[in-house]
Structure formats: structure tokens, C-alpha cells
């Protein structure tokens, strides 16, 4: 599954997941957030001080992939930083 770096319909920076947008915006308390169908993916701290995004209480953790690449893990799955077929930066979720 690809999370693509792109633009939303109104010019905002967005990441699309299977055609759905993760929109860059502000949360209710001024924190930076990405919205998925109106839900917030919040920027915060993990249990051990690492940077994490929370989605419905689950953590997307910043870490290292199996081959040393920066990855975000969601329930043990990796979101990998890479290149798309057309040269766009993408994150893949195994």
C-alpha cells in the first residue's frame, strides 16, 4: 500500500492512502495533526520517549527498518521510506 506525498484538492499538503487523504492540519489544541476521514493522527511521544503518531490510541513509531532505513511501525508492520514508480517519495506499508 502506498502513502504518496502530494497535494489535496485545496492545495494543502496531503498523503494519500488508497485514494484517501491524510491531511496536514491543526488539531483541536493547536498540535500538528494528519486527518484520516476526519480522525486525527496526532504527533506526540511514545511510551519510551520516541516520536510517534497516534491513531485511535495505537502508535505509529519512528524507528529503523530491517535494512537500516527509517521506518514507522504500525502494529509491527513497517511503513518504509522509498521511491514510487514515477519518482515520487512514498511510504510503503507491508
Model-derived regions: residue spans:
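Intrinsically disordered, low-complexity proline/glycine-rich segments
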Residues: 1-94
Amino acid at each position: 500500500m502506498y502513502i504518496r506525498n502530494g497535494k489535496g484538492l485545496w492545495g494543502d499538503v496531503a498523503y494519500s492512502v488508497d485514494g484517501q487523504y491524510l491531511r496536514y492540519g491543526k488539531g483541536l489544541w493547536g498540535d500538528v495533526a494528519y486527518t484520516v476521514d476526519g480522525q486525527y493522527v496526532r504527533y506526540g511521544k511514545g511510551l519510551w520517549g520516541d516520536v510517534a503518531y497516534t491513531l485511535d490510541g495505537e502508535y505509529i513509531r519512528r524507528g529503523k527498518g530491517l535494512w537500516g532505513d527509517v521506518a514507522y511501525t504500525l502494529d509491527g508492520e513497517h511503513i518504509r521510506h522509498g521511491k514510487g514508480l514515477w519518482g515520487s517519495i512514498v511510504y510503503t506499508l507491508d
